[in-house]
Amino acid sequence: MAQDRKKVLVLGAGYAGLQTVTKLQKTISTEEAEITLINKNEYHYEATWLHEASAGTLNYEDVLYPVESVLKKDKVNFVQAEVTKIDRDAKKVETNQGIYDFDILVVALGFVSETFGIEGMKDHAFQIENVITARELSRHIEDKFANYAASKEKDDNDLSILVGGAGFTGVEFLGELTDRIPELCSKYGVDQNKVKITCVEAAPKMLPMFSEELVNHAVSYLEDRGVEFKIATPIVACNEKGFVVEVDGEKQQLNAGTSVWAAGVRGSKLMEESFEGVKRGRIVTKQDLTINGYDNIFVIGDCSAFIPAGEERPLPTTAQIAMQQGESVAKNIKRILNGESTEEFEYVDRGTVCSLGSHDGVGMVFGKPIAGKKAAFMKKVIDTRAVFKIGGIGLAFKKGKF
């Protein structure tokens, strides 16, 4: 019987990959399949909490937990390794720790920051990308305040922070900054009036997924807490001094001691090397989340460009979508093992909430707009639910937001 076991290989332990595996281990027996999960790190991190760790309002260690803590070791083989090559036809995946065969492959390799070729952005701006970059950024911000307080010749630029991007991540990071800055000013005896936070956005509107009313709430709340917005202002370069922006056709230098890029992500760069038709690390999938020509390969999460039937544009890359895709793929793998046909993925939009620090927010929940403390509470519910969905009640108590 063991010789008939299928090899199920899952690449990536982010929201999509880990949701797939934790669902599979509940529904598939060891006689049916051998499940292997490969991830670069020994830990999973809550990517939707990185803005908190980056600002320093949440310890970076609270954002992560060991992958193996949510796995059934008798059901899943966990390998800490970096994937270097995917050979679709040979059904092999190469890593820095060896080669792994598969009958069914799930690609959930996650995201990396996308700077869209802006000169100097990768070299001179912090990225909100993973727990390592989050820790570096939060420490850098605090170091700037400490150095300013200790310096005899003070440079106000040390207290200036530039944030590129007024989308979801950028705005949530701004909210956390407005919570963190008063703490740092109190700790180091810094006049808060000297702190300058500027958000630069190329698009004509921030938070494009929300109504004008919700956007106005977010802008008013953040402006009241010291944030200045420069909307419809493209960043053309980044240097050691800050951002270079374009205003009315002319370039202007914005100076700051800290520059942060929060305006774009893309799927894993391994995608272009492994598949055709990949754009920004994402490949268009079929309705069951497999790819053309390979019914045994699923692509989900940030690497997937899933276009719902009848639609023209792919769904955005969100944790909510990634986790629903993981559940769908787990069910379809079970169906494949049973000799049944796969089912189409159907996304259920339960809503989206953008936090503005720990006490405010804006969002749409089941089609209804919410703002203020209600939105902040709902955000904590969403964050805790995500942990519960993967690790159960125990992990929710340990890592949840309540």
From Swiss-Prot:
<keyword id="KW-0472">Membrane</keyword>
<keyword id="KW-0560">Oxidoreductase</keyword>
<dbReference type="Pfam" id="PF07992">
    <property type="entry name" value="Pyr_redox_2"/>
</dbReference>
<comment type="function">
    <text>Alternative, nonproton pumping NADH:quinone oxidoreductase that delivers electrons to the respiratory chain by oxidation of NADH and reduction of quinones, and contributes to the regeneration of NAD(+).</text>
</comment>
<feature type="binding site">
    <location>
        <begin position="39"/>
        <end position="40"/>
    </location>
    <ligand>
        <name>FAD</name>
    </ligand>
</feature>
<dbReference type="GO" id="GO:0005886">
    <property type="term" value="C:plasma membrane"/>
</dbReference>
<feature type="active site">
    <location>
        <position position="172"/>
    </location>
</feature>
<keyword id="KW-1003">Cell membrane</keyword>
<feature type="binding site">
    <location>
        <position position="83"/>
    </location>
    <ligand>
        <name>FAD</name>
    </ligand>
</feature>
<feature type="binding site">
    <location>
        <position position="379"/>
    </location>
    <ligand>
        <name>FAD</name>
    </ligand>
</feature>
<feature type="binding site">
    <location>
        <begin position="12"/>
        <end position="16"/>
    </location>
    <ligand>
        <name>FAD</name>
    </ligand>
</feature>
<dbReference type="GO" id="GO:0003955">
    <property type="term" value="F:NAD(P)H dehydrogenase (quinone) activity"/>
</dbReference>
<comment type="similarity">
    <text>Belongs to the NADH dehydrogenase family.</text>
</comment>
<dbReference type="InterPro" id="IPR023753">
    <property type="entry name" value="FAD/NAD-binding_dom"/>
</dbReference>
<keyword id="KW-0520">NAD</keyword>
<protein>
    <recommendedName>
        <fullName>Type II NADH:quinone oxidoreductase</fullName>
        <ecNumber>1.6.5.9</ecNumber>
    </recommendedName>
</protein>
<keyword id="KW-0274">FAD</keyword>
<dbReference type="GO" id="GO:0019646">
    <property type="term" value="P:aerobic electron transport chain"/>
</dbReference>
<dbReference type="InterPro" id="IPR051169">
    <property type="entry name" value="NADH-Q_oxidoreductase"/>
</dbReference>
<feature type="binding site">
    <location>
        <position position="302"/>
    </location>
    <ligand>
        <name>FAD</name>
    </ligand>
</feature>
<keyword id="KW-0285">Flavoprotein</keyword>
<feature type="binding site">
    <location>
        <begin position="319"/>
        <end position="320"/>
    </location>
    <ligand>
        <name>FAD</name>
    </ligand>
</feature>
<dbReference type="InterPro" id="IPR036188">
    <property type="entry name" value="FAD/NAD-bd_sf"/>
</dbReference>
<dbReference type="GO" id="GO:0050136">
    <property type="term" value="F:NADH:ubiquinone reductase (non-electrogenic) activity"/>
</dbReference>
